[in-house]
């Protein structure tokens, strides 16, 4: 009898989706602040609807930042250059409502900049998760990797002119058939591929389907995962001309599963974009990913999740938890001990060890196509840390 398999699905949206537009604007503001002032305290939200983008939040920085220019440049770089495609970067309304960080939070977290890095408290309470699995070279879930890469490829063939009919907004979804091998996930095949992409008025549905198969799906999904039973839903609604902020309102922090593990593992609920590294929603999730990835890369387990939790103003995490889903070479309590001995979970030290105070175009890169499983020197949390432990006991 064949081993029992199951289906699991992950989705993604590309950079022209209104929620992702907002994530990118928020992280572009963060980048601009950190580039001039590494100690900037940033909590920047963005919302958008037809012909309007608003940035708002709390920012304390010595940087001189032209918020309107950042908004327009970000929208233009995505491809929002006319009302036809969903937004005109040069003509839309830009609203700005930025205040300083609350002094109550400032004194509790960093003592108005008087605390040493190791004494800096968490910027808020919260729970964060890191996840890793040996099913792909990225040590990420295959369903999430494929959905994300399809979205990135859609943008690539739009911007390089391969598919000139494409417009910025688009969504992807991939269903993978898996085998559970003692707690480890083994992908068997791709069951379903769904792509809904914004397009211009000139193209037919048949042309859309043919181009998506040839120029998007074929280069992204390895042939070994596709067979005659694989189902393709390519623009199943039949028409997607109106998109971007014209089609839907957008808001920072609305795509947190796409940003992380595509529904695998767990999520503490806190979004990443627009937050400086004292916000443990972001830095805590990054160090938890590095810990989980390092556990898998070191051979201690085939799949694992790490949870950490914080209290506002307190440097040390309240709890650290590890679960290897039964795939651990040693008991989970031993893996937990190794994690605690090898990783410093204090927010001020995470910032230093992962070099999270560097801006430029560092964080805007994270704001589309996932924060994890990416090969880029700026994604310092993706660097596997060699774990020091007694090899004999493992």
From Swiss-Prot:
Residues given in the record as K(+) binding sites: 45
Alphabetized PROSITE patterns for the sequence: ADOMET_SYNTHASE_1, ADOMET_SYNTHASE_2
The keyword Transcription is assigned to this record: no
Compartment(s) where it occurs, according to its Swiss-Prot or TrEMBL record: Cytoplasm
Pfam families listed in its UniProt record: S-AdoMet_synt_C, S-AdoMet_synt_M, S-AdoMet_synt_N
One GO cellular component term: cytoplasm
EC number annotated for this UniProt entry: 2.5.1.6
Inducing factors: During compatible and incompatible interactions with Blumeria graminis f. sp. tritici, especially in the infected epidermis. Induced by abiotic stresses such as wounding, cold, drought, and salt.
Gene Ontology molecular function terms on file: ATP binding; metal ion binding; methionine adenosyltransferase activity
GO biological process terms on file: one-carbon metabolic process; S-adenosylmethionine biosynthetic process
Catalytic activity: L-methionine + ATP + H2O = S-adenosyl-L-methionine + phosphate + diphosphate
Family matches, as NCBIfam families: metK (TIGR01034)
Protein name: S-adenosylmethionine synthase 1
């Amino acid at each position: 009898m064949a081993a029992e398999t199951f289906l699991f699905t992950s989705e993604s949206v590309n950079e022209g989706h209104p929620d992702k537009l907002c994530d990118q604007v928020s992280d572009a503001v963060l980048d601009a602040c950190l580039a001039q002032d590494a100690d900037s305290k940033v909590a920047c939200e963005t919302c958008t609807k037809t012909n309007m983008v608003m940035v708002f939040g709390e920012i304390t920085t010595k940087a001189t930042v032209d918020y309107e220019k950042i908004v327009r440049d970000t929208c233009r770089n995505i491809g929002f250059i006319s009302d036809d495609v969903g937004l005109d970067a040069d003509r839309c309304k830009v609203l700005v409502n930025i205040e300083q960080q609350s002094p109550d939070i400032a004194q509790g977290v960093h003592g108005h900049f008087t605390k040493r890095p190791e004494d800096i408290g968490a910027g808020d309470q919260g729970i964060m998760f890191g996840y890793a699995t040996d099913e792909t070279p990225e040590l990420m879930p295959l369903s999430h990797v494929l959905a994300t890469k399809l979205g990135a490829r859609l943008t690539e063939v739009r911007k390089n002119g391969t598919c000139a009919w494409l417009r910025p907004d688009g969504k992807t979804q991939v269903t993978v058939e898996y085998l559970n091998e003692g707690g480890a996930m083994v992908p068997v095949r791709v069951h379903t591929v769904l792509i809904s992409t914004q397009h211009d008025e000139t193209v037919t549905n048949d042309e859309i389907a043919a181009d998506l198969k040839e120029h998007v799906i074929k280069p992204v999904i390895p042939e070994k995962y596709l067979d005659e039973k694989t189902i393709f839903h390519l623009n199943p609604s039949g028409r997607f001309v109106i998109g971007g902020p014209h089609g839907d309102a957008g808001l920072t922090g609305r795509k947190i599963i796409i940003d992380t593990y595509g529904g695998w593992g767990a999520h503490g609920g806190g979004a990443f974009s627009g937050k400086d590294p004292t916000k443990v929603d972001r830095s805590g999730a990054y160090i938890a990913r590095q810990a989980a990835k390092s556990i898998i890369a070191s051979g201690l387990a085939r799949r694992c999740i790490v949870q950490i939790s914080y209290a506002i103003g307190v440097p040390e995490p309240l709890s650290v938890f590890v679960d290897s889903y039964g795939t651990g070479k040693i008991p989970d309590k031993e893996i937990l001990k190794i994690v605690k001995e090898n990783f410093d979970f204090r927010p001020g030290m995470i910032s230093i060890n992962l070099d999270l105070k560097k801006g430029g175009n560092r964080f805007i890169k994270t704001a589309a196509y996932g924060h994890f499983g990416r090969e880029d020197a700026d994604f310092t949390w993706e660097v596997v840390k060699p774990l020091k432990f007694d090899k004999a006991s493992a």
